[in-house]
């Protein structure tokens, strides 16, 4: 049925409740930060770099200890018994939080979706991989109202199976089981998410109040990076429309932007909304002012539960979560095509929920009584969210959803794959997945081939190192190439890294930070060494270019250490393979391109953020600590590994030798630093007595002398007895970065 003007863009009334999200976000009062006198160093000096951000999840906070092996514990788990217990849980309604329609499936789908849906592509943060929904701020986000009850319902399962199943896996798996228990065939499931035990500081937005939007947009509604959501405290978008204005077309624009930032294309986006909204309901039975504070602000006697409502019984038929009161289909506990049949089967008019939230109801009383009440009351009229109507009104989504209306099997396939991607997007390569239900590799998992040949041995490694060092390539060239390959790694979502050899492929081959013109000189030489070895090696031995790039860089580090008077062997573990261009999603990889890399003293033209802050961010994404960051920067400067062979920060008269000169000369009080009058982002270090120019630097360099924490680390490596320690620590940090994506070694 084609839509008429009643379901096109409605008039723009004042927002009833602007505090909503996709699909259950509260109209209830949201938390606001309480003002207080400065209590921390960060309060006093907010512009100082926060080195402590490089040390999240201290092992001191982990009650399971350093020796705990989750994969080994999981191997003891009877996954079929777990699944059976969870299916039983789905249909065992509890008096303290009754199940809609006698089935918790809709609630658990929302819990899993909101755990995974925090993932964002621009920095890889968020996602379900660590069970962060248990902690602030996520446990108290307006969008996560009532999910405290969902997690509490899971406690008997967690209690029974103990350390064999993590909270992170259990929270995520619950939604998968919910779908299967209601007749949907999922694409698979991978376990393997390890719990953390304390929250992590993540910049979710700069707004000073939850549900704000004023600090994340500029220009014509341009959403700042790296944010994924339109609104502070929401997972995706406001289901009443942008800022609570019920405009389905404008909402579709927000949907496309925010789901795209979660790595979903248009079809995946539509599939997730249609599939997710085929089950359950939203909750807005009464006045939202009767709902109490979120878990982090709730009274101690509520024991971690929040949003206690005094409206009626406060639960069941009286539940208030989002302020929206929508049941999407006549079969809310069964998979079928009734969401689209309902969406296209009626014309829609704008109405308000009992809590005053904007939603749509079938026009002129059509369909009255066809939607079942969750607790046996009178039948209801069909209802939809503003963002549901977007799927019909937006030409982009209408083309997709109208096709699925006639071909429900295509919807089922698209939803199964999009749901699998949603739950696993932050887990990295498939080698990290556990359990019997892991699906075949997908392009978005950045697949690499399995090793199908004998690996090089110690004698081969020694011979290859000699060939590399005799090739005419310089130490800086070899070091920079290896760093370019490995430093694409993001510890947040476990993407990038040297494995796969994608430095030779697009888009990484063309990234400015990787100096394409230099790669054009280095890679052909290494490829020739690889080809010659593979053609002549006996016993089926081969070396991948991915392995050789790392080996060549490590050989250069050994040579540089020797030139500085220190003999050391850099550990090398073969086993990387070379991916193909066909198995590399160019658009997906593009978001890994660094806006800055302080380790190479690189900044993208036009970047305005402080360099020292970007250095900390790059170190965080690499997963290195403050001491590791310090020793790596000092060592890479000594090796001459700057982007474009810049001399900034190369505080040595013997570049290419692995010395601690960077630290010694940075602390030299005979040097006075001033901002350059001719070059942006550059500082000049001049002799205090003569005024002669000695060095140039950027904030990436000088922060190590300016910041008190970093200066303390620099002092360790600048001491007269520190050269040996410096080399050993640099090599250890180097190997860590080179092996960041070698999950087979961990």
UniProtKB/Swiss-Prot annotation:
Tryptophyl-tyrosyl-methioninium (Trp-Tyr) (with M-262), cross-linked positions: 113-236
PANTHER family linked to this entry: CATALASE-PEROXIDASE, HYDROPEROXIDASE I, BIFUNCTIONAL CATALASE-PEROXIDASE
SUPFAM superfamilies on file: Heme-dependent peroxidases
Organism: Mycobacterium intracellulare
Polar residues bias: start-end ranges: 1-20
EC number assigned by the record: 1.11.1.21
Primary role: Bifunctional enzyme with both catalase and broad-spectrum peroxidase activity. May play a role in the intracellular survival of mycobacteria.
Superkingdom of origin: Bacteria
Protein name: Catalase-peroxidase
One matching Pfam family: peroxidase
